[in-house]
From Swiss-Prot:
Alphabetized UniProt keyword annotations: ADP-ribosylation, Chromosome, Cytoplasm, Cytoskeleton, DNA damage, DNA repair, Glycosyltransferase, NAD, Nucleotidyltransferase, Nucleus, Transferase
Species per Swiss-Prot/TrEMBL record: Homo sapiens
Catalytic activity: L-aspartyl-[protein] + NAD(+) = 4-O-(ADP-D-ribosyl)-L-aspartyl-[protein] + nicotinamide; L-glutamyl-[protein] + NAD(+) = 5-O-(ADP-D-ribosyl)-L-glutamyl-[protein] + nicotinamide; L-lysyl-[protein] + NAD(+) = N(6)-(ADP-D-ribosyl)-L-lysyl-[protein] + nicotinamide + H(+)
SUPFAM superfamilies: ADP-ribosylation, Domain of poly(ADP-ribose) polymerase, WGR domain-like
Protein name: Protein mono-ADP-ribosyltransferase PARP3
Role summary: Mono-ADP-ribosyltransferase that mediates mono-ADP-ribosylation of target proteins and plays a key role in the response to DNA damage. Mediates mono-ADP-ribosylation of glutamate, aspartate or lysine residues on target proteins. In contrast to PARP1 and PARP2, it is not able to mediate poly-ADP-ribosylation. Involved in DNA repair by mediating mono-ADP-ribosylation of a limited number of acceptor proteins involved in chromatin architecture and in DNA metabolism, such as histone H2B, XRCC5 and XRCC6.
Length: 533
């Protein structure tokens, strides 16, 4: 197919970068933090600490809300420790104060005190809480962190068991055995839903980020606790810009962050967050945490208990929660062949991902948002690689503006025309003998492209008169091999050729091109690919 006419572009070298930034736009990092803070606190399910000897006694429970998990990290002294306090009550109205403490990631030591009077047990609990935090238990809703003391963190237990318990008037409690309906999804989609909602996958993702999964149990990641992590990083970001008189040191601020968001460093000293690169890594980590919370919250949607004998298959239920239609493409379909060629021609020469399945994606509400750009031309199908832990969140909410790749081209949504570029951001999971990952293809309304050849992390929008920013790399898929797909009446360019050198950008700081848009509505998810990495 003949090459397409080149869109009107402007190329900017390093000497023209300064002073070209458009007006201030909302910072996505801070907007995510504000959104988390606005969410009402979840109703807590409090369980007896599983390491407590009394936890196996069915009559033992936590008295009211007398339960707390405390954390303290001090980098200078290599402290990274927790303290758990619970007031327990058994069926005979005897009371127990359970204390457990130690280094994050370990079982630690414990102590148990028995009481016959509730008031004595309360006094013991409240005394220990004040001793460890310098706060009164009655004023815990207005908790203030103090240097050298523990900080109260919000952790939530997993949901109650899945079997339904139905109360019958004037009779004993009986359990209804539910008959699960057969799954209506095809086998490939069943596997997809299983993978993207896998608790083991979420757990492994958190462990890879050195997070202490015991302090952030799956199913109930505290939104408020994540929001406090955002606040701690904002303070670090300000401190990295330059020291202020009387301000806290980076070590102190880092210690506070690790206290708020518990990390498991084993016996290693927690590293101070003392560079923009480390700060960016922790920002990305919290954004992934927020997406894990979204996926987990979908599954925790409360349903009124019904005494019905049949219930939807769990995979059908999870699929419906996505509010996104996924249509598995036949391997003989023309668009399947086009996408397969796109993958194979632009994938890595050393280890190109092996295509397994393609789904056509139709996310609820995205079509209407995308319609706002119906008159914007120059549309291209582009790659977006991601962590499996955030696939469910993306299918539910679409691609959002998040810092990626160190923010080399500012705060926008990043795409690539070469699969090998986006594949570098794919984090998958082991499934049998294969390492499985997922990649998106999005239709991006590029409009007028503004080209750059050096980093510009301050960008929050294209220059006036432009709709997108392309960080041009040394190579680009051969434009003479491009083809088009018609998607909802729009012609969308799909590269089909191998990458070829771009002499005019041979001195670019980017080896491969990165495509940036700064409005979330300017792209639409079109395809989801399952690949073996």
């Amino acid at each position: 197919m003949a090459p397409k006419p080149k869109p009107w572009v402007q190329t900017e070298g390093p000497e023209k970068k300064k002073g070209r930034q458009a007006g201030r736009e909302e910072d996505p990092f801070r907007s995510t933090a504000e959104a988390l803070k606005a969410i009402p606190a979840e109703k807590r399910i409090i369980r007896v600490d599983p390491t407590c000897p009394l936890s196996s006694n069915p009559g033992t429970q936590v008295y009211e809300d007398y339960n707390c998990t405390l954390n303290q990290t001090n980098i200078e002294n290599n402290n990274n420790k927790f303290y758990i306090i619970q007031l327990l009550q058994d069926s005979n109205r005897f009371f127990t104060c359970w204390n457990r403490w130690g280094r994050v990631g370990e079982v630690g030591q414990s102590k148990i005190n028995h009481f016959t009077r509730l008031e004595d047990a309360k006094k013991d609990f409240e005394k220990k809480f004040r001793e460890k935090t310098k706060n009164n238990w009655a004023e815990r809703d207005h908790f203030v962190s103090h240097p050298g003391k523990y900080t109260l963190i919000e952790v939530q237990a997993e949901d109650e068991a899945q079997e339904a318990v139905v109360k019958v008037d004037r009779g004993p409690v009986r359990t209804v055995t539910k008959r699960v309906q057969p799954c209506s999804l095809d086998p490939a989609t069943q596997k997809l839903i299983t993978n993207i909602f896998s608790k083991e996958m979420f757990k492994n993702t958190m462990a890879l980020m050195d997070l202490d999964v015991k302090k952030m149990p799956l199913g109930k990641l505290s939104k408020q606790q994540i929001a406090r992590g955002f606040e701690a990083l904002e303070a670090l970001e300000e401190a990295l810009k330059g020291p202020t008189d009387g301000g806290q040191s980076l070590e102190e601020l880092s210690s506070h962050f690790y206290t708020v968001i518990p990390h498991n460093f084993g016996h290693s000293q927690p590293p101070p967050i003392n560079s923009p690169e480390l700060l960016q890594a922790k920002k990305d980590m919290l954004l992934v945490l927020a997406d894990i919370e979204l996926a987990q919250a979908l599954q925790a949607v409360s349903e009124q208990e019904k005494t019905v004998e049949e219930v939807p298959h769990p995979l059908d239920r999870d699929y419906q929660l996505l509010k996104c239609q996924l249509q598995l493409l036949d391997s003989g379909a023309p668009e399947y062949k086009v996408i397969q060629t796109y993958l194979e021609q632009t994938g890595s020469n050393h280890r190109c991902p092996t295509l397994q399945h393609i789904w056509k994606v139709n996310q609820e509400g995205e079509e209407d948002r995308f319609q706002a750009h119906s008159k914007l031309g120059n549309r291209k199908l582009l790659w977006h690689g991601t962590n499996m832990a955030v696939v469910a969140a993306i299918l539910t909410s679409g691609l959002r503006i998040m810092p990626h790749s160190g923010g080399r081209v500012g705060k926008g949504i990043y795409f690539a025309s070469e699969n090998s570029k986006s594949a570098g951001y794919v984090i998958g999971m082991k499934c049998g003998a294969h390492h499985v990952g997922y990649m998106f293809l999005g239709e991006v309304a590029l409009g007028r492209e503004h080209h750059i050849n050096t980093d510009n992390p301050s960008l929050k929008s294209p220059p006036p008169g432009f709709d997108s920013v392309i960080a041009r790399g040394h190579t680009e898929p051969d434009p003479t091999q491009d083809t088009e797909l018609e998607l909802d009446g729009q012609q969308v360019v799909v590269p089909q050729g191998q990458p070829v050198p771009c002499p005019e950008f041979s001195s670019s700081t980017f080896s491969q091109s990165e495509y940036l848009i700064y409005q979330e509505s300017q792209c639409r998810l079109r395809y989801l690919l399952e690949v073996h990495l």
